[in-house]
């Protein structure tokens, strides 16, 4: 069975891992780094992903970052005049991860386990699955990030019974989950979170502070300058990371903008204390879900055995202090917060292929599910934190006399009124025989699969007529749209491959021109003039083809020149060999010496 890779598709960074010899292992990217920025850029029709895209973000307006924040919405991003859905952008990142995983493994990769924030709703999960499909991946399982982290942490400790709190603060999302580990069973007791809170927001408070300081000093508002803002974003991210290790950092951005008197420079010193003050509100926002999860699990903080920190933003000292204060214990430092989620996804891949035995994962649904009933009330069928997969049915009736159809409005959320919750979908059950209100019996069944994706069925118990829907949110993609995007993604992958081959061909041709010139210099006076002229003509023809950028011609002229140069090089070696042999022969004749020898008997020594 082919390997199933584990992918942590993050807001700011992504990571891919695989199970090798029973151990999960992170696959490094082509630059040698273990995580890849979730950044896509377009430049003259060419796509760039990861490190390369992030490096030129300052100067390229067609750079897309943090697209995960828009998953499951109808938000579109525009680049070079074309609009893309968040699914397509995520698919480009997934394709990049898939590509270098294939190079590392030396075999095609078609299956993956992809992680999502525990608090992702159905639309966001469906969008993630669609992104995988567009990238040419069969998404075997969608699992929650904190659950994956617990899996990576607890795999070696299956004989211990533990209650673990996973605090996951990523680039754009925040989750907290409480799990019980024991006998190879990883059971999620409760989960809570905020999908609009992460490291990006910590960067933003620094950016806002720098903009305010600069305006106070120079009277110029940098927030109106797109290029200055990108430089500020990079500087803010770096300052945030620096302040995890030092108590003060200097932010220096020369020539940030120009005033009436000439260029202006930004020089600001930021202390850790000031950063703590700026981000205090954000840190406090993460505490409410921690309290909520403990309450839902029916636990007090003292009953926790371990607190595990996941996500790069958990390196912020104020975050660590707050979680320590809230739970009364030091967070466990034995896992790499950037990699642990991908490692857990790879382990889940191993569970699915049968390479990892005796591990059972019991996840939960993060939000309650139900339908709208009379008066706009949200009636829950499945409560949040219910272990999945699960199904639940309830019988409803009509609200008016002689009603022949009912609208089933499916929602997800915790608020009592339908209008305040997230619509997952709507469908209609028709042809109900006319009857007084309250008489028809309509059974509504909810079914949540192992990926947390919802199916809903409505059945008229009188006629046995049934209507079913797999929830595809209003922002979801149709099968035709997905197929079109899959095709486009494949074409782009081919185009990227072709572009790479073209660049390599040009480089080889340039290299050949250089080596030819060097070889001809070495051959001066050693071969016939006609042969040198022939080589020079072929070299000039290749140079002209490179100038014209005609790939077919470059290939033909390169092969032609290579043949001529090889023949000349063979001649050069032959001449060198003949000269060497002649030299050795002469040396042998000169060195002949008559000698006498005496045999020594060892016994006499």
UniProtKB/Swiss-Prot annotation:
The keyword ATP-binding applies. The modification Phosphothreonine is found at residue 173. It comes from the Bacteria. Keywords: ATP-binding, Chaperone, Nucleotide-binding, Phosphoprotein, Stress response. Residues 578-605 are annotated as: Disordered. Residues 591-605 have a biased composition (Acidic residues). Induction: By stress conditions e.g. heat shock. Residues 578-588 have a biased composition (Low complexity). GO terms for molecular function: ATP binding; ATP-dependent protein folding chaperone; unfolded protein binding. The keyword DNA-binding does not apply. Acts as a chaperone. NCBIfam families: PRK00290.1, prok_dnaK. Belongs to the heat shock protein 70 family. This is Chaperone protein DnaK.
